[in-house]
Amino acid sequence: AGGWRLGFLAVPKKLNKFLSSLKSLASESYSTVNTPTQFAAVEAYEGDYSDYKLKVRGILNAVGNYVYSNLKSNKILINPPQGAFYLMPEFKNSKYKSSAKLCEAILKDTGVAMLPGSDFGFKPKKMLTRLSYTDFDGKEFFRNVSNYNSISEEMVKRYAPNVVEGVSKLSNWAKNL
């Protein structure tokens, strides 16, 4: 999920008056794209990758739903995944003074790394975190999926064992809040 990114900007005609301002802001965020990313983009835009995208979405959906199903509890508030590669669990009844301190404790106690909600503009005292669920061998998982609509929990356990282990550790840790 980490790595180099490439973006583009599409603006409806009725918002053209904002285009120069948007370009100026955008140039500070994602200009000077590195050469490997440019070559990858050319390849990506030339081919038909619809089956690939459906399969990858199916895998991320299955893994995300596994994380959601196994974390939601009276100690952890969490919404189901909606297309990203991370979830935003909120820890209830927390004894920590900030989401950053909460994440530090979780990392120390479980080995699970999360980002504090305060890194994303939430109030530091809100015990909201961001948890990525991409710690798995995507190539191996992809190779073993034949039907992206029916990825079982067993497949998630087999091909995303680090995610499964992390969710288990996090769930057990939260029971002591």
Residue ranges and their predicted role:
Residues 7, 41, 60, 87, ...:
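Generic structural signal for small/hydrophobic residues in well-ordered secondary structure
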Residues 1-58, 68-69, 150-153, 167-168:
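Conserved core segment of the aminotransferase class I/II
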Residues 58-68, 78-91, 127:
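Conserved glycine-rich beta-strand-loop-beta hairpin in the small C-terminal domain of fold type I
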Residues 71-79, 176-177:
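Surface-exposed helix-capping loop/turn segments at secondary-structure junctions
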Residues 105-114, 120-177:
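PLP-dependent enzyme catalytic core of the Aspartate aminotransferase-like
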Residues 74-78, 113-118:
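A short linear hydrophobic-aromatic micro-motif
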Residues 95-101, 139-142:
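Short, conserved charged micro-motifs
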